[in-house]
Amino acid sequence: MPAVLSSVLSNITDFVVHEGNGVKGLADMGLQSLPKQYIQPAEERITTSTVIVDDTIPVIDLSEWGSDPKVGDLICEAAEKWGFFQIVNHGVPLEVLEEVKAATYRFFRLPAEEKNKHSKDNSPSNNVRYGTSFTPHAEKALEWKDFLSLFYVSDEEAAALWPSACRDEALTFMRNCDAVIKRLLKSLMKGLNVTEIDGTKESLLMGSKRINMNYYPKCPNPELTVGVGRHSDVSTLTILLQDQIGGLYVRKLDSDTWVHVPPINGAIVINVGDALQILSNGRYKSIEHRVIANGSNNRISVPIFVNPRPNDIIGPLPELLESGEKAVYKNVLYSDYVKHFFRKAHDGKETVDFAKIN
């Protein structure tokens, strides 16, 4: 083993986390085997026995959205039965999708010292964060992923703080998704018989947004690790753009089996987050998902997390309780909920249980 590689492997945390090399830096060294710090327990790895190969999440064509009420019904049904669906003919131009994917690669190909300017230790703002894995300080086994997280406050802040390698493309992608997000949420609220989205509800549903750029390098021994461990999102909705490599798996409702989300050119993946599960009093399902590592290809994805504001109180919507439903969840300060999620390693649906009424 070359001396440089031996030195890196003896102190992976410094190299990967503190020096900003990320897991991409490890992969670029031509590793022949997976470092022990990334080996996941057997129960956290996906196996062929737990995957259903002839099933997948719904694909919904939005081309008739304005004229056909069945489209809204399909959206609500998918949110109830799957918590995940793909949308096509959504109105976001294909070139916008391709440009934000290219910008993601451009950022992660920057030198480590350039990316590290945006790390937890160096970034001038908590709203811009480059990192690796999920919560390295709390994980027994690391995840094979690097990320850039950009919390949107204003165009002015983005211009000042977001990395120039991907800033314009990330903003353009977010702007182009805004109309789709609003229409999705309007359809989902209609399915709950909530017909008016006032200022308070708009804040609860889409008061804040964060866009992530995720990079999953080619991995030695991919079967021993994960790109992302089992979790559900803390968002209201997540709008995910994935590339053509594949690797996203979704747990089928009320089962221990998983289905692959096949890449469809031009499609966007939508999933219900914990906040919407709580707001809908459990009607819409925030489902566990995970990403496998890949031994042959690098993979990227670009999710937009649509969230309540940090100081919003989330709980079952009043309209649902007024109709006689019993509350399944308590009211929770959203920032407390998010802190609970980020203080620990990925652990499936444990966070949403934190909000349940015992």
UniProtKB/Swiss-Prot annotation:
Please tell me whether the keyword Transport is annotated for this protein: no
| This enzyme's EC code(s) | 1.14.11.61
Pathway(s) where this gene product acts: Phenylpropanoid metabolism
Which keywords annotate this record? Dioxygenase, Iron, Metal-binding, Oxidoreductase
Matches recorded under PROSITE patterns: FE2OG_OXY
* Nucleus recorded as keyword: no
What the entry lists under Pfam families is as follows: 2OG-FeII_Oxy, DIOX_N
Q: What does this protein do?
A: 2-oxoglutarate (OG)- and Fe(II)-dependent dioxygenase (2OGD) involved in scopoletin biosynthesis. Converts feruloyl CoA into 6'-hydroxyferuloyl CoA, and, at low efficiency, caffeoyl-CoA into 6'-hydroxycaffeate, but has no activity with p-coumaroyl-CoA.
Which family is it part of? Answer: Belongs to the iron/ascorbate-dependent oxidoreductase family.
Please give the name of this protein.
Feruloyl CoA ortho-hydroxylase F6H1-3
What gene is it encoded by? F6H1-3
